[in-house]
């Protein structure tokens, strides 16, 4: 059993081709997991404001802005994580990777090939890496 917590690469971007095994990720941020890129900031009420029209205290209808459900977390978008590793498996061995929780819409690639994913947020899942 190997720990995969150290020496990951991360970028926040909306490009394509990040699953490529040949992608140069040398400029990406070096991180360890667990990692939550949203809490790195910057924070602003403008990032997640919503209009509230009912004032339950004064029993009137007002329009005003206040930070919504994320408390002004930074821009919502896509984050990409990469991990470089080698497996030297014997024919009778297998390998799998376990995720304790990824925010949502996770897609996992190994050597440029789609392995699997999870559409739900912060739920654990495991994937078999043996064929890859």
Regions found by a protein language model. Name each.
Residues 1-61:
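Accessory carbohydrate-binding/adhesion or oligomerization-edge regions at the termini
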Residues 50-52, 66, 112:
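Charged interaction patches that mediate protein-protein contacts
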Residues 2-15, 36, 44, 71-132:
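Accessory beta-strand-rich segments of carbohydrate-active enzymes
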Residues 58-70:
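N-terminal glycine-rich cofactor-binding segment
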């Amino acid at each position: 059993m190997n720990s995969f917590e150290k020496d990951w690469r991360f970028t926040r971007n909306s490009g394509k081709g990040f699953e490529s095994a040949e992608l140069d990720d040398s400029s990406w941020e070096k991180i360890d997991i667990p990692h939550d890129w949203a809490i790195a900031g910057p924070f602003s009420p403008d990032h997640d404001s919503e209009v509230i029209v009912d004032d339950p205290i004064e029993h009137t209808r007002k329009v005003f802005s206040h930070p919504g459900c994320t408390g002004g977390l930074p821009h919502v978008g896509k984050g990409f994580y990469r991990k470089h590793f080698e497996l030297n498996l014997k024919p009778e061995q297998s390998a799998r990777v376990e995720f304790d929780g990824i925010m949502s819409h996770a897609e996992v690639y190994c050597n440029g090939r789609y392995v699997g994913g999870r559409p739900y947020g912060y739920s654990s899942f495991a994937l078999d890496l043996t064929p890859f």
